[in-house]
């Protein structure tokens, strides 16, 4: 009997133990990352040929203590390598692990190689050659602290390389893991199996090979035992012949079918080629279509299983598409696959929540470095009374109602950017803005009293419903989370995409950026105020303070202003403002852009303006500003500085976003100024529900 070790992916050890025992292994002991077992020579070949789950089959050769590189050399030489190598066999050494003595794995591999070669030369035997690409023998050495474990890898290449997959195509999961996913899915061979996001077909091919009793090692052309002196070619050929016979019989007797689809035609062609090479191509129907086109291929039965490894993302801006995909899959399963089972393997358990399905079972496993989960679901049978599955119906109805009203209004006004929804329903606490053919969902961060999982699930529902109501593809939707800002406002960078979208607002063309910042470059609630500035600016010198991206300057310039002066502290936003001005044919000396602390610049400036627009922050204590600013506390002092720059008969439009702001009319009167509140005139229908989003005033000399 040989003592052996079968390695596997983390989380699959118990499954592998059961498989090895069915093959005849004895003394199976599960450890992290594999199973120790015992078996004769025939079992070695059986496990290599038939294990669908093992990554490698290892034959331990010995151990040694390593306190110096000489210890490693002598420990390796203690093994009788001349009785292990066939004459002329090539070899390669794979060394892993480090300690205080062996600090480089390449150095460790070199010492092992030297010890093996010297074992031959000392006996005056021909030295074996190293072949790193396709060796006849592969020696594995693991160094754990002071102990080196030396073994012969009888697999050669990893056992996940079945021989059917085109190596030029990357697979998101190895074949060994795919086989485990199929085994854990609850699918019964002989029943239909469907993968709606099949990629190169790995899950379906592994399932078909299992169902037709086709050994996973049948198509491999190279093994790690070809140079092993104890290799028994007779037994190996018997094992191989048995596998070939069983494969022919299994394929001839199998009657059920497999279905795979993917949106990428090139990937589907690769899947077809892989299935043909695996010998089960006739059993699988591959189609080019996305999940939105998914339908039950057997609506009249029998029931089967849907299995998949759907895509996942780590970036916030990739979530809308993925949430939409999962939500759509969940609804399609409920509407068309009643009585079927569903099994999904994912690195993102949160995304599986958007299916709106309750899992019956779940398993954990590693996919390389990723912690993954596999969840199995049973889809209830549909009846004549069953209603089609919907998502966030109250929210969807409100959004649909708002869209019907506002879309027509926006078209008549000549605007492409407007708010469609602003937390109209308390349980759906988001804002939805339309920017041309795109939409932005801003999630208001829920209070700590709200269960985070429920809030996230509700967000998934909102995304799916928004895409459905607006009829836009997922890549046209942007998701943002808006939290209470503490000292960091719209200048906070979120991304580096640099994607700008050109939109129209009345007669102006403006650039917006939906992904890189918390705000988009256009404050929608100030739309009417900007139009008013355009109407007031003909022949006037216009000053725009705290200008952001200069959209007010654009409207003033298009309204016939003699000059525009745009002041902001941010170089990024001033460059953006310049792009906006140029987009509208406004450039040259008449349109100045000044980077400065607005309050400091205001105190030192000595120019005169006919029309001034100022929309300061509610509060700021930026390090780049000389002092803190509070709009309630400091607005009179601000008006004092502005008055100095205001020509006789001039006007200041003053706006801010502080809720409950109280204008100090007496303080203004002492300065010789009067204030007229025009807030209601500046609120458009899309902000009718939120009348405190800003307040706006016209201030003139008394």
From Swiss-Prot:
It comes from the Bacteria. Keywords: Cytoplasm, Methyltransferase, RNA-binding, rRNA processing, S-adenosyl-L-methionine, Transferase. Residues 43-154 form the THUMP domain. GO terms for cellular component: cytoplasm. Its EC number is 2.1.1.173, 2.1.1.264. One of its GO terms (molecular function) is RNA binding. It is found in: Cytoplasm. Its main location: cytoplasm. It is an enzyme of class 2 (transferase). It catalyses: guanosine(2445) in 23S rRNA + S-adenosyl-L-methionine = N(2)-methylguanosine(2445) in 23S rRNA + S-adenosyl-L-homocysteine + H(+); guanosine(2069) in 23S rRNA + S-adenosyl-L-methionine = N(2)-methylguanosine(2069) in 23S rRNA + S-adenosyl-L-homocysteine + H(+). Belongs to the methyltransferase superfamily. RlmKL family. Specifically methylates the guanine in position 2445 (m2G2445) and the guanine in position 2069 (m7G2069) of 23S rRNA. This is Ribosomal RNA large subunit methyltransferase K/L. It comes from Salmonella paratyphi B (strain ATCC BAA-1250 / SPB7).
């Amino acid at each position: 009997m040989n003592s052996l070790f079968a390695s596997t992916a983390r989380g699959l050890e118990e499954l592998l133990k059961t498989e090895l025992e069915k093959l005849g292994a004895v003394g199976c002991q599960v450890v992290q990352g594999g199973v120790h077992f015992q078996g004769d020579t025939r079992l070695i070949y059986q496990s290599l040929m038939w294990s669908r789950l093992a990554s490698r089959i290892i034959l331990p050769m010995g151990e040694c203590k390593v306190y110096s590189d000489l210890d490693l050399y002598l420990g390796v030489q203690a093994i009788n390598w001349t009785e292990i190598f066939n004459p002329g066999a090539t070899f390669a050494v794979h060394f892993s692990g480090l300690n205080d003595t062996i600090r480089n794995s390449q150095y460790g591999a070199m010492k092992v190689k030297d010890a093996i070669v010297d074992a031959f030369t000392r006996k005056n035997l021909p030295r074996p050659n190293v072949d790193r690409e396709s060796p006849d023998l592969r020696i594995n050495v693991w160094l754990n602290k002071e102990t080196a474990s030396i073994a012969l890898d009888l697999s050669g290449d990893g056992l996940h390389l079945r021989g059917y997959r085109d190596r030029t195509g990357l697979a998101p999961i190895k074949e060994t893991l795919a086989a485990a996913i199929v085994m854990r899915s609850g699918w019964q061979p002989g029943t239909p199996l469907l993968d709606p996001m099949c990629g190169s077909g790995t899950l379906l091919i592994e399932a078909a090979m299992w169902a037709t009793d086709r050994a996973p090692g049948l198509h491999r052309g190279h093994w790690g035992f070809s140079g092993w002196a104890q290799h028994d070619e007779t037994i190996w050929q018997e094992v191989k012949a048995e596998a070939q016979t069983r494969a022919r019989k299994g394929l001839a007797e199998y009657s059920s079918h497999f279905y795979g689809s993917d949106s990428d035609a090139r990937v589907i062609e690769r899947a077809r080629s892989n299935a043909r090479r695996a010998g089960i191509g006739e059993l699988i129907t591959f189609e080019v279509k996305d999940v939105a086109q998914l339908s039950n291929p057997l609506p009249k039965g029998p029931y089967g299983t849907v299995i998949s490894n759907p895509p996942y993302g780590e970036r916030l801006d990739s979530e809308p598409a993925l949430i939409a995909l999962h939500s759509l899959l969940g609804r399609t399963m409920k509407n068309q696959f009643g009585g079927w089972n569903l099994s999904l393997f994912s690195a993102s358990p949160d995304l599986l929540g958007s299916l709106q399905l309750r899992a019956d079972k779940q398993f954990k496993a590693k996919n390389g470095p990723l912690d993954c989960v596999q969840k199995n679901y049973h889809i209830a049978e549909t009846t004549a009374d069953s209603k089609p599955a919907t998502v966030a119906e109250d929210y969807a109805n409100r959004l649909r109602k708002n869209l019907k009203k506002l879309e027509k209004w926006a078209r008549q006004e000549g605007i492409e950017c407007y708010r469609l929804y602003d937390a109209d329903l308390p349980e759906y606490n988001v804002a939805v803005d339309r920017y041309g053919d795109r939409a932005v969902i801003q999630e208001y961060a829920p209070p700590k009293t709200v269960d985070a999982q429920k809030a996230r699930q509700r967000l998934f529902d909102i995304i799916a419903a928004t895409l459905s109501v607006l009829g836009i593809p997922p890549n046209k939707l942007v998701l943002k989370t808006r939290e209470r800002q503490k000292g960091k406002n719209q200048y906070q960078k979120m991304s580096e995409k640099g994607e700008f979208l050109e939109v129209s607002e009345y007669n102006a063309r403006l650039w917006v950026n939906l992904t890189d910042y918390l705000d988009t470059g256009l404050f929608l609630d100030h739309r009417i105020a900007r139009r008013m500035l355009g109407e007031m600016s003909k022949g006037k010198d216009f000053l725009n303070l705290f200008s952001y991206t200069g959209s007010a300057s654009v409207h003033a310039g298009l309204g016939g202003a003699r000059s525009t002066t745009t002041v902001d502290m941010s170089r990024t936003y001033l460059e953006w403002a310049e792009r906006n001005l140029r987009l509208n044919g406004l450039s040259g000396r008449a349109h100045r852009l000044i980077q400065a602390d607005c309050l400091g610049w205001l105190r030192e400036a000595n120019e005169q303006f006919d029309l001034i627009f100022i929309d300061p922050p509610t509060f700021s204590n930026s390090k780049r500003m000389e002092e803190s600013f509070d709009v309630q506390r400091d607005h009179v002092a601000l008006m004092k500085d502005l008055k100095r720059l205001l020509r006789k008969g001039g006007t200041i439009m003053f706006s801010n976003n502080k809720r409950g702001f109280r204008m100090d009319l007496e303080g203004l009167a002492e300065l010789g100024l009067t204030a007229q509140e025009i807030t209601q005139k500046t609120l458009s229908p899309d902000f009718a529900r939120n009348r405190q989003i800003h307040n706006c005033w016209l201030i003139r000399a008394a």
